[in-house]
Amino acid sequence: MVVKVGINGFGRIGRIVFRNAIEHDDIHIVAVNDPFIEPKYAAYMLRYDTTHGNFKGTIEVDGADLVVNGKKVKFYTERDPAAIPWSETGADYIVESTGVFTTTEKASAHLKGGAKKVIISAPSADAPMYVMGVNNETYDGSADVISNASCTTNCLAPLAKVIHDNFTIVEGLMTTVHSYTATQKTVDGPSAKDWRGGRTAAQNIIPSSTGAAKAVGKVIPDLNGKLTGMAMRVPTANVSVVDLTARIEKGATYDEIKEVIKKASEGPLAGILAYTEDEVVSSDMNGNPASSIFDAKAGISLNKNFVKLVSWYDNEWGYSRRVLDLISYISKVDAKKA
């Protein structure tokens, strides 16, 4: 079953979701909406990407629309989500990637244009959050607006699930060493709510807040209140890494922990949690579609109950792939209920 998908917001994640969809057999992007980009510029931005390279295919402009690999993609420029005529193209599932409409009420506006479901590509204050491989099986089709959580939660949650299921996490602290993103500054500038966040991204390591660890408690209720974390924004353009330091109830050697993670990466979490013993660095993970790539040689343990685990993630590519995997999954659940 091919699912027809629309994208609202053709920024960083919107475009990377589009590129990933080309490799996703059961996803067809039929429409894009962005009020700030004209079709010719959208085609240019999709064709050329500093981080992920040139688009491997054909991109043309036909009037006000795009033609990608010979298939027409309707291009809208509506500012109000409620005004986007998604039903014209049959787009049933909408990726809400503007970063603006992140609540159930705001994202629900897409339903007025004929969409059936909205997937927010960011954490949401009130929409149910799903992380593939962790709690996606709890989706029952009742919610019209859902969230794919954050890229960091998608990296941390599968790892935390494996550790908790096998050894029981008593408590833990997470640090994500995170590449800079579009919200940061190219030169020092005003940032009233976060003074440090206003400093030049390419020249500083910037301590920052993140709700990613606490959000794990929403997708793994048993870990609610047991994890928290922070971020260090660093001068790299893409790829980030999670450092999870946890106290576990059931003692285990580091080798035993590695074996459990390796087994999960080859079994139930294949494609979501990956495992490597190579001497990798961040750029080696650019374009990796996994949510979380466990680095077996980077972790350490103090004793059998206190361990530090390290896992990489392409915060653009891997996250965008999960957005599409989530749509593919929920569309099958929805079809059974129809």
Curated annotation (Swiss-Prot):
UniProt-annotated binding residues for NAD(+): 12-13, 34, 79, 315
Family membership: Belongs to the glyceraldehyde-3-phosphate dehydrogenase family.
CDD domains xref list: GAPDH_I_C, GAPDH_I_N
The entry's keywords: Cytoplasm, Glycolysis, NAD, Oxidoreductase
Broad class of the protein's primary localization: cytoplasm
Organism per entry: Neurospora crassa (strain ATCC 24698 / 74-OR23-1A / CBS 708.71 / DSM 1257 / FGSC 987)
PANTHER family recorded: GLYCERALDEHYDE 3-PHOSPHATE DEHYDROGENASE, GLYCERALDEHYDE-3-PHOSPHATE DEHYDROGENASE-RELATED
One Pfam family linked to the record: Gp_dh_C
InterPro entries per the UniProt record, alphabetical: GlycerAld/Erythrose_P_DH (IPR020831), GlycerAld_3-P_DH_AS (IPR020830), GlycerAld_3-P_DH_cat (IPR020829), GlycerAld_3-P_DH_NAD(P)-bd (IPR020828), Glyceraldehyde-3-P_DH_1 (IPR006424), NAD(P)-bd_dom_sf (IPR036291)
Disulfide linkage: none
Gene Ontology biological-process entries: glucose metabolic process; glycolytic process
UniProt subcellular location: Cytoplasm
Enzyme Commission code: 1.2.1.12
Reaction(s) the record says it catalyses: D-glyceraldehyde 3-phosphate + phosphate + NAD(+) = (2R)-3-phospho-glyceroyl phosphate + NADH + H(+)
Gene assigned in the entry: gpd-1
Amino-acid positions noted as binding D-glyceraldehyde 3-phosphate in the UniProt annotation, renumbered to this chain: 150-152, 181, 210-211, 233
Pathway in which this enzyme or protein is active: Carbohydrate degradation; glycolysis; pyruvate from D-glyceraldehyde 3-phosphate: step 1/5
Name listed for the protein in its UniProt record: Glyceraldehyde-3-phosphate dehydrogenase
Gene Ontology, cellular component aspect: cytosol
Residues carrying the site annotation Activates thiol group during catalysis: 178
Domain of life of the organism encoding this protein: Eukaryota
Assembly with partners or alone: Homotetramer.
Cytoplasm is among the record's keywords: yes
Active site residues per record: 151
Gene Ontology MF terms in the entry: glyceraldehyde-3-phosphate dehydrogenase (NAD+) (phosphorylating) activity; NAD binding; NADP binding
